[in-house]
Amino acid sequence: MQGVADILFLKGVDLGIVRSDTLDYLEKKGYANNIKKQFTFITKLYNEEMHVLAPKSINSMAELEGKTVAVDMPNGGTFVTSAIVFERLGIHANFAYIEQRLAFEKLKKGEIDAMISVQGKPSKFNSSVKDENLHFLPVDYAKSLQPDYLPAQLTSEDYPSLIPKGERIDTIAAPAVLAAYNWAPNTERYRRLARFVDAFFNKVATLQQPPFHPKWKEVALNAPLAGWSRFRPAQEWLDRNSSTLASADTRRRFDQFLGDNQARAFARPEDREALFRQFMDWQKRQPMTR
């Protein structure tokens, strides 16, 4: 929620990163009316996964009924996502507003029953956890969560000290959004945002390559966002570059098709390129669907 407040009220701030579920939460809880009309979105960025850390004596989200769960501070994204998820799953937990490091100490001492963090994997904090008595709880992709969240997994590659080798934990992810204040088109602030869009969109392909963070690969510039209006210069850029984006999307689908295990088998660039050409030939032979 802090990101939303900064965009609305902090002098000189034109845009920021917010979770896609935050504006809906503020509106439904009566904190603001028609708040989405004050915002526009540039693009969907990366996904932030829900990490529910608990003792091994607790095995499911349902077992957190009536338990004490740390959800970080009440003005943060972890709190908002936790509040929405627990409400939609019908789980009534006692939320404790405790900073992450302190919450971890309380969890180890048994003073709380679980702690939640919603962060892009692998998160620095969860990667540092080494306690054989703790594990991640699975978060099922229930129908009630599907309008606002995406299915995700935490793997042993992400957290080797918390997840046994070769295993995966189902969870959900909240999309992070690059959002901006909805300035009028005839203002200098609007024109500055338009210049930013042009510079940023032209650099995204570079940011999706090493040595930059793997999360950049989740950025899909042309991905729609339900209930949000896209900044007009951003949409105009997408319209001008639609063919280039289609090619990039094909490459991304190919990488997903390969998967982690197959990717290791085709580690050499020349092997991956040869397989990619076969993949493209296969796509061309597929019947058109309407």
Give the ranges of each region predicted by the language model.
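Ligand-binding clefts/hinges and TM-proximal coupling segments of bilobed small-molecule sensing domains
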Residues: P74-V85, A152-A226
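An extracytoplasmic/periplasmic, membrane-proximal ligand-sensing/linker region
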Residues: L102, K108, Q119-E132, F136, ...
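Pocket-lining segment of extracytoplasmic ligand-binding domains
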Residues: S20, G30, H92-E188
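Residue-level preference for short coil/turn positions at secondary-structure junctions
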Residues: K11, E65, I172-A174
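Solvent-exposed, acidic/flexible segments
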Residues: M1, R19, T43-Y46, V71-F79, ...
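Solvent-exposed loop/turn segments at secondary-structure junctions
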Residues: Q2, D21-Y25, E49, I58-S60, ...
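Bilobed "Venus flytrap"/periplasmic-binding protein-like clamshell domains
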Residues: N47-E105, K109
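Short, glycine-/small- and polar/acidic-enriched structural segments
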Residues: M1-E63, A70-M73
